[in-house]
Amino acid sequence: MSKPSSCKAYLGIDYGKKRIGLAYAAEPLLLTLPIGNIEAGKNLKLSAEALHKIILSRNITCVVLGNPLPMQKGLYSSLQEEVSLLAEELKKLSTVEIILWDERLSSVQAERMLKQDCGLSRKDRKGKTDSLAATLILTSFLDSLPKKLTL
């Protein structure tokens, strides 16, 4: 997994078959914010085109795409394959750095946070889980970066 060399604005993505959750962070604060969802396109090319518009509109320099790694080593899921193909489609459209980041249990954690911490009903959680999962993915990635000490 490579570390970004000069990323300034980040887009976190939680890919799903129905919805794609989005989160945003930019230097110098790197405060991660959920920015909503987009509907997954009928195919990966349409989803990549919709994401590319967001990349351009927010001047994104680094995309952190949640990679749904299996809980057991050696297994490979169809969703993991779709994420890899989505990354390839994005690379065809944009020169931004695309990083596949371990997102195991991010949606489960987001769902739990919305239910237990926020007390939201299943109906109220719908649509919020994906962008919160994207926020958790992006925050996890940013937390892994070396901290810059400024005095």
Curated annotation (Swiss-Prot):
Its EC number is 3.1.-.-. It is an enzyme of class 3 (hydrolase). Coiled coil: none annotated. One of its GO terms (cellular component) is cytosol. The keyword Cytoplasm applies. GO terms for biological process: rRNA 5'-end processing. Keywords: Cytoplasm, Hydrolase, Nuclease, Ribosome biogenesis. It is found in: Cytoplasm. One of its GO terms (molecular function) is nuclease activity. CDD domains: YqgF. It comes from the Bacteria. Pfam families: RuvX (PF03652). Could be a nuclease involved in processing of the 5'-end of pre-16S rRNA. Belongs to the YqgF nuclease family. This is Putative pre-16S rRNA nuclease.
